[in-house]
């Protein structure tokens, strides 16, 4: 059917081309100038439209969905500050390599720099954060313009999902009328059908690149792995859609190297952990100082250094692991499909341009039969077992060689939730302390868990929206573990529970402010610490749960409110299991004391260090 006007024709062609390129959902926010795009999306049968009121939340929702699927999720917004509100999520997508497409509607060019209402300079609005940018021409109802439009859209999607995935930006100007009203003689009746309606499939089929080392380079790397006794595979936070755990496991078996798996790598959790040496508690015993026993000496000095390290994904969450790797002196191969540098300690000796999972699969076939050093592998496995045992005993009220009362701490909350996750599950963790506690206190498990977080630029904004976006792309049960400040930053995101039909169990770790700053030297400087860093707020979250229709449970885990860590853990386990199995969404608020949790982390650190590097745990 002939379009009623050129804007409708243009928007319809753009949206059609997105669907042809494999897009199955868009996230749109209400606005006038974007009307042609929103209407075209709403009238497309093969496209799901998520309507989000707030553009910042919308962008993070799309980010979370794209992170979960590895496929581009377009955004649609009107002109002006609406487009600017996408910027934080675009920054995260750029650093974390998440495919996004920002479709920002705009006034026509003659109104720019004219004082016209709701008009700003949107050209290259996101700067170098996007992989591809195009300021589209005004809609033109002719064959050449439509072919150009379709080609540009196909290129944008192909770039967003390419070897170096990330956000792309198309700025789309429209004149009035913006609604699908008929304008006499605005659209010719004799348009080329291919230009008007597209081809079967994408107008331009963009074949993604697959960088791989040549045979000679692969043999050299394989030979070094095969002749190395003490090697490590370090799996950092993975680019969407994640590392292939089976391929990484196969390489571990072929070389005999243990896998140090970040919780966001896609390798720490899953059935492969039954047979692979997956190490997860390294943050508890690497580079730890034993207070009063080892002085300033690094406990990791007692370990032999690795000879070779194969690094996959982004830089690990664990600062201690990064420090350990920086000081080893080993040959370190940083694997990156786009040839970008992602290792801020500058300890890597080689940059291997390759897709990590495919490289692991090729290397595992090449070096099959390597054993590595059994004692070296056992050292890591034993240390991990000891750390997990001590963390488990602490839950039962027993820190080895420590006679002080045991207090429930925030890391316990992560362990309780992880132990009770269904199979399969999607777990989204906030930045600040939750992701660090997940890293240190939750070891490998056979449960199929997709663990996600925003570790690109590691902000605490947009966490709720990102989690719900991820939940919109899966039938898994969705759990979000979030801090109080991160939840406060993104309460608008909770609107998606109802508007986008997503259910979630939200576990809120409320320590009344910036608990992570207890981990930093600024803690010693008062009153600046409390007034400008800790920033206690006293917010009550139950009314917020009522506002957004979440069932609510409060668990008070502060030391002056409980008898033992075990009681709180049991209460949390019961609350989480009940919420998980119930219909709808649930907020479980766990009130904690940041200073107490900080002390308990330090006590556990010392206990693990004594057991792994010094005296045996009692």
UniProtKB/Swiss-Prot annotation:
The keyword Ribonucleoprotein does not apply. Binds 1 thiamine pyrophosphate per subunit. Pathway: Quinol/quinone metabolism; 1,4-dihydroxy-2-naphthoate biosynthesis; 1,4-dihydroxy-2-naphthoate from chorismate: step 2/7; Quinol/quinone metabolism; menaquinone biosynthesis. The keyword Ribosomal protein does not apply. Its EC number is 2.2.1.9. Its cofactor is Mg(2+); Mn(2+); thiamine diphosphate. One of its GO terms (biological process) is sulfur compound biosynthetic process. One of its GO terms (molecular function) is manganese ion binding. Residues 192-215 are annotated as: Disordered. It is an enzyme of class 2 (transferase). Pfam families: TPP_enzyme_M_2, TPP_enzyme_N. Keywords: Magnesium, Manganese, Menaquinone biosynthesis, Metal-binding, Thiamine pyrophosphate, Transferase. Signal peptide: none annotated. It catalyses: isochorismate + 2-oxoglutarate + H(+) = 5-enolpyruvoyl-6-hydroxy-2-succinyl-cyclohex-3-ene-1-carboxylate + CO2. Homodimer. PANTHER family: 2-SUCCINYL-5-ENOLPYRUVYL-6-HYDROXY-3-CYCLOHEXENE-1-CARBOXYLATE SYNTHASE, PROTEIN PHYLLO, CHLOROPLASTIC. Catalyzes the thiamine diphosphate-dependent decarboxylation of 2-oxoglutarate and the subsequent addition of the resulting succinic semialdehyde-thiamine pyrophosphate anion to isochorismate to yield 2-succinyl-5-enolpyruvyl-6-hydroxy-3-cyclohexene-1-carboxylate (SEPHCHC). Belongs to the TPP enzyme family. MenD subfamily. This is 2-succinyl-5-enolpyruvyl-6-hydroxy-3-cyclohexene-1-carboxylate synthase.
């Amino acid at each position: 059917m002939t379009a009623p006007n050129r804007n409708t024709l243009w928007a319809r062609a753009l949206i059609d081309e997105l669907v042809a390129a494999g897009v199955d959902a868009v996230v749109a926010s209400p606005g006038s100038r974007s009307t042609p795009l929103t209407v075209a999306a709403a009238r497309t049968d093969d496209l799901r439209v998520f309507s989000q009121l707030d553009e910042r939340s919308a962008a993070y929702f799309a980010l979370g969905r794209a992170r979960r699927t590895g496929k581009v999720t377009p955004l649609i917004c009107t002109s002006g500050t609406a487009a600017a509100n996408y910027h934080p999520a675009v920054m995260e997508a750029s650093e974390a390599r998440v495919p996004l497409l920002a479709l920002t509607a705009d006034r026509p060019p003659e109104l720019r720099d004219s004082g016209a209402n709701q008009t700003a300079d949107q050209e290259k609005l996101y700067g170098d954060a996007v992989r591809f940018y195009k300021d589209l021409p005004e809609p033109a109802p002719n064959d050449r313009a439509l072919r150009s439009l379709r080609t540009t859209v196909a290129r944008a999607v192909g770039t967003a999902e390419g070897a170096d995935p990330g956000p792309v930006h198309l700025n789309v100007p429209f004149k009035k009328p913006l609604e699908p009203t008929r304008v006499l003689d605005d659209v010719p009746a004799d348009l080329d059908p291919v230009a008007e309606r597209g081809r079967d499939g994408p107008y331009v089929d963009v074949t993604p690149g697959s960088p791989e080392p040549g045979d000679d380079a692969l043999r050299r790397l394989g030979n070094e792995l095969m002749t190395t006794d003490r090697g490590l595979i370090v799996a950092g936070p993975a680019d969407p859609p994640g590392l292939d755990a089976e391929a990484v496991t196969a390489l571990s078996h072929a070389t005999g190297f243990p896998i140090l798996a970040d919780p966001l790598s896609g390798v720490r959790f899953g059935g492969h952990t039954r047979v692979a040496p997956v190490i997860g508690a390294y943050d508890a015993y690497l580079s730890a100082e034993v207070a009063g026993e080892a002085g300033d000496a690094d406990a990791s000095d007692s370990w032999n250094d690795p000879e070779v390290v194969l690094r996959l994904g982004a830089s690990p969450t664990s600062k201690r692991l990064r420090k350990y790797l920086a000081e080893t002196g080993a040959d370190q191969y940083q694997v990156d499909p786009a040839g970008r540098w992602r290792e801020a300690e500058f300890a890597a000796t080689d940059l291997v341009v390759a897709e990590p999972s495919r490289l692991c699969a090729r290397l595992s076939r090449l070096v099959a039969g390597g054993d590595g050093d059994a004692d070296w592998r056992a050292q890591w496995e034993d240390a991990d077992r000891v750390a997990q045992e001590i963390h488990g005993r602490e839950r039962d009220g027993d820190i080895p060689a420590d006679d002080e009362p045991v207090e429930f701490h925030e890391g316990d909350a992560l362990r309780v939730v992880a132990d009770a996750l269904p199979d399969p599950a999607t777990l989204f963790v906030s930045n600040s302390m939750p992701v660090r506690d997940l890293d240190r206190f939750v070891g490998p498990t056979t449960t199929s868990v997709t663990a996600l977080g925003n570790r690109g630029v590691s902000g605490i904004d947009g966490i709720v929206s990102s989690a719900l976006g991820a939940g919109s792309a899966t039938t898994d049960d969705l759990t979000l573990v979030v801090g109080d400040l991160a939840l406060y930053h993104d309460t608008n995101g909770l609107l998606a529970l109802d508007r986008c039909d997503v259910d979630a169990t939200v576990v809120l770790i409320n320590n009344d402010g910036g608990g992570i700053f207890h981990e930093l030297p600024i803690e010693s400087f008062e009153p600046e610490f409390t007034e400008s860093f800790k920033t206690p707020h006293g917010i009550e979250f139950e009314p917020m749960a009522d506002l957004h229709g979440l069932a609510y449970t409060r668990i008070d885990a502060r030391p002056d409110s409980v008898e033992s860590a075990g009681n709180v853990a049991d209460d949390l386990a019961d609350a989480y299991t009940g919420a998980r199995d119930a219909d709808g969404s649930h907020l479980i608020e766990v009130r904690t004391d940041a200073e107490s949790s900080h002390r308990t982390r330090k006590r556990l650190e010392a206990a693990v260090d004594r057991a792994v590097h010094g005296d045996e745990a009692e």
